[in-house]
């Protein structure tokens, strides 16, 4: 893999095991929008970029080689060999083998921890389209405006100064109270997000569950997508259905150290095959 600087964009060569739609529009992150030309425009780590793929060449507009080194290499999880991981986990169960073959371009995004926490609080009893709308309004109302008119995700410190009523423009309902509680506990150090990278898994989950409204599912999603705890195995309605129907008598522990990656293959496969249920 090589990063080449071009005019206001970078080209990354030899990119494998990445499908932008499967990765950016599958319920991991809620700030990416599909463009008419097949590219995706989004904001992460305070950077507004457009990402496209041409076979094994990836282009990131409005980015530099330093941005790739410091942000995007990690964000797209290029340090992991997903081909080898698929080979390993596909031996666990025939249905998982089928699911991994169905969407081999899924990668686990390494998102900002606080953004992952808030967006999965918002995801409770919600659909992807509505989640994206709430997240967009949260950023437009309380995030820092970027040069191109987009908005960064607001910081915990910014949101901690607000009340649930201040979030009324989001139209997020009961989730407003949870967002403010999360921001306040992160900002004042009661909940230490950085510790969740290294704590034992159950302790990391318990740390996040100090926040009002954060149960196991939101905590597991935050750990998987915000801390890259790829042993996490979030269970939502789709996954509960999939486990009962396709993997009876199995649980997340049965999928090993890459359970979170297996979960994404199963989640996507289940959503795309409703006839199985």
Residue ranges: model-predicted function:
Residues 1-277:
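HhH-family (HhH-GPD) DNA N-glycosylase catalytic core used in base-excision repair
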């Amino acid at each position: 893999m090589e990063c080449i600087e071009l005019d206001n964009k970078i080209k990354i060569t030899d990119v494998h095991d990445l499908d932008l739609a499967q990765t950016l529009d599958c319920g991991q992150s809620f700030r990416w929008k599909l463009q008419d030309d097949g590219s995706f425009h989004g904001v992460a780590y305070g950077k507004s970029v457009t990402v496209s793929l041409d076979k094994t060449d990836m282009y990131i507009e409005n980015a530099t080689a330093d941005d790739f080194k410091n942000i995007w290499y990690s964000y797209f999880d290029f340090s992991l060999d997903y081909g080898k991981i698929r080979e390993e986990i596909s031996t666990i169960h025939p249905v998982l083998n089928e699911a991994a073959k169905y969407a081999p371009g899924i990668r686990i995004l390494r998102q900002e921890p606080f953004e992952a926490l808030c967006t999965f609080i918002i995801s409770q009893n919600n659909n992807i389209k509505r989640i994206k709308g709430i997240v967009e309004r949260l950023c437009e109302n309380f995030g820092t405006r970027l040069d191109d008119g987009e908005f960064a995700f607001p910081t915990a410190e910014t949101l901690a100064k607000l009340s649930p009523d201040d979030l009324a423009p989001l139209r997020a309902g009961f989730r407003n109270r949870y967002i403010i509680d999360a921001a306040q506990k992160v900002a004042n150090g009661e909940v230490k997000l950085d510790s969740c990278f290294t704590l034992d898994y159950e302790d990391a989950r318990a740390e996040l569950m100090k926040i009002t409204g954060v149960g196991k599912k939101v905590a597991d999603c935050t750990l998987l997508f915000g801390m890259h705890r790829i042993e996490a195995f979030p269970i939502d309605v789709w996954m509960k259905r999939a486990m009962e129907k396709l993997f009876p008598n199995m649980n997340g522990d049965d999928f090993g150290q890459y359970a979170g990656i297996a979960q994404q293959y199963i989640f996507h496969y289940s959503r795309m095959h409703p006839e199985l249920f």
